[in-house]
Curated annotation (Swiss-Prot):
Stored Pfam families: ADDB_N, PDDEXK_1
Function of the protein: The heterodimer acts as both an ATP-dependent DNA helicase and an ATP-dependent, dual-direction single-stranded exonuclease. Recognizes the chi site generating a DNA molecule suitable for the initiation of homologous recombination. This subunit has 5' -> 3' nuclease activity but not helicase activity.
Assembly: Heterodimer of AddA and RexB.
Highest taxon of the lineage: Bacteria
EC number: 3.1.-.-
Known cofactor(s): Mg(2+)
GO molecular function: 5'-3' exonuclease activity; ATP binding; double-stranded DNA binding; helicase activity; hydrolase activity, acting on acid anhydrides
EC top class, as a word: hydrolase
Miscellaneous section: Despite having helicase-like domains, this subunit does not have helicase activity.
Organism: Lactiplantibacillus plantarum (strain ATCC BAA-793 / NCIMB 8826 / WCFS1)
Keywords linked to the UniProt accession: ATP-binding, DNA damage, DNA repair, DNA-binding, Exonuclease, Helicase, Hydrolase, Nuclease, Nucleotide-binding
Name assigned to this protein: ATP-dependent helicase/deoxyribonuclease subunit B
Length: 1200
């Protein structure tokens, strides 16, 4: 029985000294038992290394076996000693099971808890509580100890926390005692077991040199071993003994010094012999790292500088984190590729360790960077299971039932691809399934189906109506309906019976049985196995392990649930919450996929000291030292107060260190990380973060740089074309070609700069050579040539071939005028929208188009109803008009396309707003009619619609012998004014926003609607007036803004009705015909003034004016406008048939562009900075300029 310390700084080979002591004792006492204990995290590597050293010591380097020496972690030692003990055979309770049990305890005691009761539903709280319970156990605190601490605490938050912890902890211990073995119980059981053993002849070697702390439970095992007669040797990272008093917080070796002091005092009080300290004396690191160790342990203020160049410590900065990782990868590849005279000096991937304080900032970059560099790597961090599709399936499955089949929940289940329909007894093909799910999602987004719609037996009917449809279901629509209903009926036939059985389950065991049977029968386990096999085929061992681990964890939680709560009445809500709590604490077991791979970890974790090279990435002042943030139920202040009272309890009790203590340990933690390297230590940091904020070197690094006068290298993500040193950018062929492309792109951009002077830029010869090598490579050359060809790519669409034009458009174009307006805004957008027929998916929403359709339908129905009953609109009373409106509105709202207006309370409110608006407009139109001789003749007049029995002729234009264009449309309202034998026909277009007739846009083809509609009226005048003898003139084209205007007090000074008339005043163009204008507004027949209804005024001399808007045009001017509009239609059709698809978005008045609201930006990739991409700027034109241009232009001349 004795205690022996092996001391020394991190630069020394502690293990060499420990193994030497072990060998000497083993040779002297070969029949004794030897245990070599290390942290679980590095057990495997340590075991291999210790056995290799023993083999060398005993002269058996090729083949060596040892039965007396065991290398274990503390938990593995428990298994070795107690595997046949009854106490060790009880069922294990996993972290997930602990969370489930704690959740149930919190529920049971919710009324007694002062603080924790309200936190049960908070995400992460149960896991946080589990950590706190575990800390109490590892501190050797029993429930009665916590009760005593609560009683002694002053009233306040701490007392309330301890009160709640005591209740939960007591119930937790009672629920698990002799029933389950928790992770924290294993060491308690081991301690109890050791107290019953005679350990004389047992030699224990505890290696703590690679880290600083030993938890209270493990300290208890060491002291028990000493008491029971074992010889214990402990290696500590400590350069001096600590016997008289405990070290002060903040000193470099505070943690190991404190442990030395505690164990020394323990042995001294119990008169256990303490042998003379042994110091490790053999350096395990290169000379430059020895110097770093000496410097770090000295007084930086008194340092005189390192006289010899330090070739083992290196610094570099990069322009970004991504460049930083790429540079680390290139260095690793270069070092592995270099061969030395002595093979022992060669590097393997396993010789490299990449560390940073927190990996979060690099997490998303690791896989793409190292895969591209073809570097095998292993991230040594636990990953949560919470995001696995199986977990999502379970959560979403029960959410469907709880939320009554909401869209999001059903889609969450379907998109896990774990529940899939069977076709002829086999799982549905995955690609076909995805297509069906996507179509179903589009359909329900469009139709708003949710809730009981999912479980109805009737088929869902898919329809897609577009302009020109004849109302006949197509084969394509029928196929889409089939796919949608496949998913619909799968949900309807699969889920409701399952939910019904679950609700009827009498207890937890029955419910779990139903759930497992359901998942198994639906092929979930088969799908998980298929995922595993697919990952193995890809040689992705990590991904292959995830499905099995998740399913095993899930089944383990169900077993624990049945054991704990299986006999109790089943509650779905509680069951799901317990599963969620369980998965919250579950993580994957990390399994390296190969022995030779780069290790990536965090500097706060225990690391093996066998790595030859360490990269400390992200070495900024934000994380070195780290900003310690605690997220524990017991705060640092709570722990400080508790630590003062723990001494009053029996036994040794040590809580986890507070943030203050941890911050004091940062220097030691980083010291251990630095000295993890044996040959080389690299510090790196980006110059800026992702938000372009400047980042600075850590003060630790600055001190090291000053001490050793280290040169700092800077690496950029983009190479300098003129730099002959390409080594920082040479990696794999794929990685290197990307940098070659960057160089040649830079050269091309520079040489095409219009402002450049001097000789053309030429790339350095090394880049020319690299390009040649890569493009001529037998395996990689074809891809390299394709990638290099991208340099000559121009973002410019290629003209369509005649065959493509015919396939897309045929020989005849049937079009609305708005499509041709799109063509004039941007030819390529027209091609995407109407050639390829790309469009955004429909959603169940009240769009501007939907509200416009409602307004049009109501006003159309109102006027037709009045005409049917032979009631002139101007003579309809307020009561009559209100009754007609109510009837028509009710009929319109019953139509399927307006069901959205009854889908929610918000939509019901919007429905009332729409009804109020259309009512106001109807009364406004009636009041306008009272002042005018114009009467609505027809509404919603179709012209040129294929498949319609009623309607007017299309506007037909023959382009050439084989091509033609036919324009169709719908006129909202046609007004007629009869003056003696002269008929005037005018059109009114309803708009949901302010519109006016824009001569400039009409000239450029951006606003052709009104002129096209007037032309259609002119071509169908006889059919419209019902006589081929009548004299007909066009009255004009007017916009009416559909609105329920807001009136200010000043607006109604002239009367309320007059104010409303002014707000609803027509805008547009009218024929400058005195006879017409005189009858348009009866108030102006006897005097002058501005019309309240129409956009004109009568002057004192009796003439008429259109004002600034140039609303009045002569007959000749109107004819020229119509002729020019026809020319625009023909010119557009000619360009379309010629295959023109230029990316030529217009820009008007230096602010309005064709791309402002385009849904195709990601396809167009338009960039005005590119030489080949430029806006088509349209010179601004006034109304007078347009009319003058049309007067001087001759027929057929280009409008631009």
């Amino acid at each position: 029985m004795s205690l022996q310390f092996v001391l020394g700084p991190a630069k020394m080979d502690h293990r060499r000294t420990m193994v030497a002591q072990l060998v000497a004792t083993l040779m002297a006492k070969p029949q004794d038992q030897f245990f070599y204990l290390v942290p679980n995290h590095i057990k495997f590597d340590t075991e291999v290394d210790v056995l290799n050293r023993l083999a060398q010591a005993f002269g058996q380097p090729d083949l060596y076996a040892q039965t007396q020496v065991q290398v274990f972690s503390f938990t593995r030692l428990a298994w070795y000693l107690m595997k046949n003990e009854a106490a060790y055979q009880v069922p294990r309770l996993s972290a997930a099971g602990i969370d489930m049990l704690l959740y149930r305890i919190l529920q049971r005691h919710a009324d007694e808890l002062r603080l924790f009761g309200g936190e049960i539903s908070q995400t992460g709280f149960v896991t946080q509580l589990a950590r706190e319970i575990n800390e109490l156990q590892t501190a050797n605190l029993q429930p009665e100890d916590v009760v005593q601490l609560a009683a002694n605490a002053q009233a306040g938050d701490l007392q309330a926390k301890l009160h709640d912890l005591a209740i939960v902890y007591k119930d937790f211990v009672a629920a698990t005692a002799d029933k389950y073995l928790k992770p924290a119980d294993i060491l308690v059981q081991l301690n109890a077991y050791l107290r019953r053993q005679d350990l004389h002849g047992t030699h224990v070697y505890v290696e703590l040199a690679g880290f600083a702390q030993l938890p209270a439970q493990e300290q208890g095992i060491v002291t028990t071993m000493l008491e029971q007669g074992a010889d214990v040797t402990i290696s500590l990272m400590l350069d001096h003994k600590v016997v008289d008093r405990a070290p002060e917080n903040g000193t470099l070796f505070y943690q190991s010094g404190r442990l030395y002091y505690r164990l020394y005092q323990y042995a001294r009080i119990r008169q256990i012999p303490v042998s003379q300290d042994i110091y490790a004396e053999t350096p395990r690191v290169a000379p430059g790292l020895v110097a770093l160790d000496d410097f770090w342990r000295g007084q930086p203020q008194a340092a005189t500088g390192y006289e010899e160049p330090n070739t083992n410590v290196h610094l570099f900065r990069t322009d970004s984190r991504q460049t930083e990782l790429a540079q680390v990868g290139r260095m690793i590849r270069a070092m592995v590729a270099k061969k030395h005279a002595d093979p022992a000096d060669d590097y393997h991937y396993r010789d490299f360790l990449i560390m940073t304080r927190h990996l979060d900032a690099y997490q998303t970059m690791l896989a793409p960077t190292f895969h591209e560099l073809e570097i095998p790597y292993f991230v040594d961090l636990q990953r949560s299971m919470a995001d696995h599709p199986l977990v999502e399936l379970i959560n979403a499955l029960f959410d469907i039932d709880a939320q009554q089949y909401q869209y999001r929940d059903v889609m969450r289940v379907l998109k896990t691809e774990l529940l899939m329909p069977n076709i002829n007894g086999q799982p549905m093909d995955r690609q076909a399934y995805r297509q069906a799910v996507d179509l179903t999602e589009n359909f329900i987004l469009k139709s708003g189906y949710h809730g009981q719609r999912w479980v109805q037996r009737e088929d869902w009917q898919y329809f897609q109506l577009t302009e020109g449809d004849a109302g006949v279901e197509t084969d394509q629509n029928a196929e889409i309906s089939r796919q949608i209903n496949l998913i619909h009926h799968f949900v309807a036939e699969t889920l409701p019976p399952f939910f019904k059985k679950m609700r009827q389950a009498p207890d937890g065991k029955a419910a779990v049985t139903l759930l497992v049977n359901f998942l198994t029968s639906q092929g979930v386990t088969d799908q998980l196995l298929a995922w595993r096999d697919q990952a193995l085929d890809r040689q992705d061992v990590r991904a292959a392990a995830e499905p099995e681990q998740t399913w095993q964890t899930f089944c383990g939680m169900l077993d624990e649930y049945v054991t704990i709560l299986g006999a109790e009445p089943f509650e779905i809500t509680d069951f799901l919450a317990l599963l969620q709590a369980g998965f919250e604490g579950a993580s994957y077991s990390q399994i390296p996929s190969t022995l030779d791979q780069v290790l990536i970890s965090e500097s706060g974790m225990v690391q093996s000291q066998d790595h030859k090279v360490v990269f400390m990435v992200g070495a900024t002042d934000l994380v070195m030292p780290d900003r310690i943030m605690t997220n524990n139920l017991l705060s640092d202040v709570d722990k400080e107060n508790l630590q003062l009272t723990l001494s009053s309890l029996d036994g040794d009790h040590y809580l986890n260190d507070s943030a203050v203590v941890q911050l004091g340990d940062e220097s030691c933690l980083n010291y251990l990380a630095f000295l993890s390297a044996r040959r080389h230590l690299f510090f790196s940091a980006p110059l800026k973060d992702d938000q372009e904020t400047d980042l600075n070197w850590s003060n630790y690094v600055r001190r090291i740089q000053r001490q050793f006068n280290l040169r700092e290298h800077t690496y950029l993500g983009t190479p300098d074309p003129t730099n002959a040193d390409a080594r920082p950018f040479v990696g794999t062929k794929r990685r290197t070609i990307s940098h070659v492309i960057q160089v040649y792109r830079d050269v091309l951009t520079t040489n095409t700069d219009r402002n450049r002077v001097g000789a053309p830029l030429q790339p350095a010869p090394v880049w020319v050579w690299l390009r040649q090598q890569l493009t001529r490579d037998p395996q990689f050359g074809e891809l390299a040539r394709q990638l290099m060809a991208g340099l000559s790519y121009r973002n410019q669409p290629v003209k369509l071939t005649p065959a493509s034009v015919e396939a897309l458009y045929g020989h005849q174009i049937y079009t609305s005028i708005s499509k041709l307006e799109e063509f004039y805004r941007n030819q390529y957008a027209y091609f995407l929208k109407y050639g390829l027929k790309l469009r955004e998916r429909d959603v169940f929403e009240l769009s501007a188009a939907s509200t416009g359709e409602f307004f049009h339908a109501v006003l159309d129905g109102l006027i037709k109803a009045l005409r049917s009953d032979q009631i002139p609109l101007a003579q309809a009373s307020d009561q009559q008009l209100g009754q007609y409106l109510e009837t028509v509105t009710r009929q319109i709202l019953d139509q399927p396309q307006f069901t959205i207006l009854t889908s929610s309370n918000r939509m019901a409110y919007l429905q009332r707003q729409l009804i109020n608006t259309v009512r106001q407009i109807a009364f406004a139109i009636r009041n306008q009619s009272k002042l005018s001789a114009a009467e609505p003749k027809q509404t919603e007049i179709l012209f040129g619609n294929v498949g319609k029995e009623h309607g007017l002729k299309a506007l037909d234009f023959q382009i050439d012998a084989t091509h033609s264009v036919h324009v169709r449309g719908k006129i909202d309202r046609l007004d007629q004014i009869q003056v003696a034998d002269q008929s005037y026909l005018g059109i009114v277009d309803y708009k949901s926003s302010q519109h006016k007739f824009d001569f400039q846009e009409a000239y450029y083809g951006l606003a052709m609607q009104m002129l096209t509609y007037l032309d259609a009226v002119l071509h169908n005048e006889q059919a419209l007036v019902g006589s081929d003898q009548a004299a007909v003139k066009l009255a004009g084209a007017l916009y009416m803004h559909i609105q329920n205007p807001t009136l200010k007090p000043k607006d109604i000074q002239g009367g309320f009705e007059a104010a409303l008339l002014k707000k609803n005043k027509y805008k547009g163009i009218l024929l400058d015909d005195p006879q017409l204008l005189e009858h348009l507004d009866s108030e102006l027949q006897q005097g002058n003034g501005t019309s309240k209804v129409y956009p004109f005024a009568r002057k004192k001399d009796g003439s008429y004016s259109g004002g600034r808007a140039a609303s009045l045009v002569t007959n000749d001017q109107l004819e020229r406008l119509l002729q020019h509009n026809s020319q625009l239609i023909i010119a557009a059709a000619e360009a379309i048939f010629a295959g023109e698809i230029q990316l030529n978005p217009i820009r008007l008045n230096d602010k309005t562009t064709a791309l402002q609201y385009s849904p195709y930006l990601s396809i167009m990739q338009f960039d005005a900075m590119l030489a080949e991409n430029a806006y088509r700027d349209l010179p601004p034109l006034s109304a007078k300029q347009v009319l003058d241009l049309l007067k001087t232009q001759k027929g057929g001349e280009n409008h631009e």
